[in-house]
Regions:
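Beta-propeller fold detector
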Residues: 53-57, 96-102, 144-149, 192-197, ...
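Repeated scaffold domains used in trafficking and secretory/extracellular systems
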Residues: 16-26, 60-71, 104-114, 148-160, ...
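Blade-level signature of beta-propeller repeat domains, shared across WD40, Kelch, NHL, RCC1
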Residues: 320-356
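Conserved loop/turn motif of beta-propeller repeat scaffolds
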Residues: 29-30, 74-75, 117-118, 164, ...
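Structural motif
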Residues: 39-43, 84-89, 128-134, 174-182, ...
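Solenoidal tandem-repeat scaffolds enriched in leucines and small polar residues
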Residues: 119-208, 215-219
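Hydrophobic beta-strand positions that form the internal "hydrophobic ladder"
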Residues: 32-33, 78, 120-121, 167-168, ...
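A short helix->beta-strand "capping" segment at the edge of beta-propeller domains
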Residues: 1-20, 47-57, 308
Length: 356
């Protein structure tokens, strides 16, 4: 058996911020849009985390409803969906279109989704039933409205797929169920298919070859791999097997668990973010954990019953780390929000399980 690998990652770029962003939108040119809970401004960054512009776009959180920002694949349009409206601006933040709707309830809301050719955009608004709308962008006309099964019970997240005529709609309902839909569309038709095999799964991403989709568990379930385009289950990694590794985190009262995030970093390897703030590595083919990423400046510390850091093994009740969120960006790098208030980028080497 190959030895468990610890892979150190030096910081490539970092940007100190006054507060961690409520949302990070990854742009097609490798840059980013940041918005914040308590500030109305949006900051545009380039791929090196240098500021391009900063503008008041009223993108703050209101009544516990985040503003969700989406950019079109050609970077010409920006969509902002908040508590009471969906807005579209140009790439400089100038308003082009606005759709007002009833307020979302606390912690609900919807993102937006642009088609690959920037011909259409989709969003959900709260009506008697939450309704999925398709907007034709050439004249800003809503051409489809599809009532969904719930009303003010879900948040709505969109994900692109390798097929430009299909996308995914995820509907997490707080601490309750998570449902995933596959949406197919043409210029004049749209269908929704519930993917029941993905119930209570958190959407991850597609492998770079476009053949496999990964999901993280909502609670104690397994990490799942699904084929594409069939979306059939091809593999599962139960958490008890993922964490069956000989390491130093055995003293906590509750064991480590997956923290809602599993992401492909290449065609052979996926990353699993854990409750203890760890970045575990697993092999796509054997579904075994073989290593851990150690990003520079991101520590995992032991805590005692009072929530204070401790080095006394007999006092340890839990562990926690510095990583708040992580994503894989357009360049295949690791993008992290850090507990210090910094945004950090780490280059990822080519990583795969070693064979012996």
């Amino acid at each position: 058996m190959a030895a468990f690998r610890n892979i150190s990652l030096p910081i490539s770029y970092k940007l100190p911020l006054e507060q961690n962003p409520a949302g990070i939108t990854i742009l097609a040119d490798g840059g980013y849009l940041l918005n914040f809970s308590a500030k109305p401004e949006v900051i545009r960054l380039n791929a090196s985390l240098q500021e391009v512009w900063r503008k008041d776009l009223q993108a703050q959180t209101r009544n516990h409803v985040n503003c969700e920002i989406t950019a079109s694949p050609d970077n010409r349009l920006i969509a902002l969906s908040n508590e009471t409206a969906v807005r579209i601006t140009d790439s400089e933040g100038q308003l082009l279109w606005q759709y007002d709707h009833a307020p979302w309830y606390h912690f609900m809301g919807s993102g937006c989704f642009f088609s690959a050719d920037t011909k259409f955009m989709w969003f959900v608004s709260p009506e008697e039933q939450d309704t999925l709308h398709r907007l034709r962008l050439s004249d800003f006309t809503i051409i489809d409205s599809y009532p969904l099964e719930t009303s003010q019970e879900c948040a709505y997240n969109f994900y692109a797929t390798p097929d430009k005529n299909k996308f995914l709609l995820e509907t997490p309902a707080g601490q309750d169920a998570v449902t995933l839909y596959l949406i197919r569309f043409s210029d004049d038709a749209m269908t929704l298919e519930e993917l029941t095999q993905c119930n209570d799964c958190i959407a991850g991403n597609f492998s770079p070859d476009g053949k496999t989709f990964i999901t993280a568990p909502h609670y104690s379930e397994a990490i799942q791999l699904l084929s594409f385009p069939g979306m059939e289950k091809t593999g599962a990694l139960p958490q008890e097997i993922l964490f069956d590794i000989n390491d130093r985190y055995k003293d906590a009262e509750e064991p480590d668990s997956v923290n809602y995030t599993a992401l492909f970093i290449n065609n052979d390897t996926f990353l699993v973010f854990t409750r203890f703030g760890r970045c575990l590595l697993a092999d796509r083919h054997t579904l075994t954990c073989f290593g851990e990423l150690l990003p520079e400046g991101c520590d995992t510390r032991a805590y005692d019953f009072s929530g204070n850091p401790t080095t006394d093994p007999t006092a340890i009740v839990d562990y926690g780390g510095d990583i708040i969120t992580l994503q894989v960006n357009m360049q295949g790098q690791l993008l992290i929000t850090h507990s210090s208030g910094e945004l950090r980028v780490y280059d990822l080497p080519e990583i795969k399980k070693e064979t012996v």
